[in-house]
Amino acid sequence: MSTQTEPKLVTQIDFARAGQITPQMKEVAEREHRDPEYIRERVADGRIAIPANIVHIKKGMRAFGVGEGLSTKVNVNLGISGDKADAAEEWKKVKIAEDFGADAIMDLSNSGKTRQFRQQLIDETPLMVGTVPMYDAIGYMEKPLVKLTKDDLLEVVRAHAEDGVDFMTIHCGINKSVIKSFKETGRLMNIVSRGGSLLFGWMEVTGNENPFYEFYDEVLEICHEYDVTISLGDSCRPGCLYDSNDATETAEMIELGKLCKRAWAAGVQVMVEGPGHMALDEIAANMKLQKRLCHNAPFYVLGPLVTDIGVGYDHITAAIGGAISASSGADFLCYVTPAEHLCLPNAQDVLDGLMATKIAAHAADIAKKVPHARDLDDRMGQARRKLDWDAMWKCALDPVTGKKRYEESPAATEGTCTMCGKMCAVRTVNKIFEGTTIDLGMED
């Protein structure tokens, strides 16, 4: 009789490979109108991730699936900044994210009581919570960047895992080989990833390999213990159109593909992060290349922004790219606000960025034929045909703004709006089919 104990099942991928459907898989299946076995199979082979830290599950989080055949998810970035440390303002942003349909919140706090804010966020929000431990490392360890050790960085990763973070962006792919390519490529915008630039600086000063790459197995051990999904950060994403699809971006993507396989072998769920800035005609091919190189792992992208000159309107430039990227294979969109490249976004910026990204994600889901993606659109068409404004608000992605604008400009003719008033095409045709006389030159 064998005395060898069976390995402990901890992560969603562990259970999926053992043929077990978890409550989280069932929840995702119900929300996505999929069979639970469809979800289990794709979690098992890494095509779907369910970022759900075991600590956060106990606090009542909702389960969200990211990946193949599922609706495109949307993330909101927020957090306390050193130049504008206002926790109350950040909590307003959390409320907006929850009320207006975000699926995830990334806490990018890098100043002040970061752990207190993070813990309270995880206690209170049912959404997925992500972080970037590298942002927190300097303040958490109370050391200058170049004095941080491998053990310091792993301690920060563990602290975030213990707090209940569901997914962590960790820049594991920027190793010495990728840096060599970066230096030889001659980029216009160099490295625009904040976490990636910090690691590049640390590596240049110390002469050491990226500790997240060199000690990747130890990172995976922590992630497995708490079922943290590792979101492999793309340090060398293009920060302008000129740099898109260059050798450096591709070199790092190849490394990220290798790291995907190592994570899956360790029973850790994975997502891979992508661009960035990219011309419209390059996006679809880039999505397909990433899926190929990273073995169909869920792809999490920032836009991409399709022009570099939309300053003040980058929620629009990113939404255009986001619709293309998500319809071409990306699974998760990080929102971009009108404040991008300019300042810390305020609450209105967050709403504008979230809605632009939600629209992009929804448009992509219709194109991808995600089950029931078009249901609300069809219901909206029916409501508009009937001029049923209350029904329209129930279909709208942002019913608050729509209703507010409508009521601010009341029409003289009941059931219409001030754009057309009595000449409303829908009203006219309805009256014809109802057998009502139409005479736009006189009162009805």
Which residues are covered by each model-predicted region?
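Basic/polar N-terminal segments that are highly enriched at the extreme N-terminus
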Residues: 1-10, 442-444
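Alpha/beta enzyme core
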Residues: 3, 11-309, 313, 319-332
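Hydrophobic alpha-helical segments with strong N-terminal bias
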Residues: 3-6, 313, 349, 405
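Catalytic or ion-coupling anion/metal-binding cores of large enzyme and transporter domains
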Residues: 180-207, 238, 242-244, 344-444
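C-terminal catalytic subdomain
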Residues: 309-318, 324-370
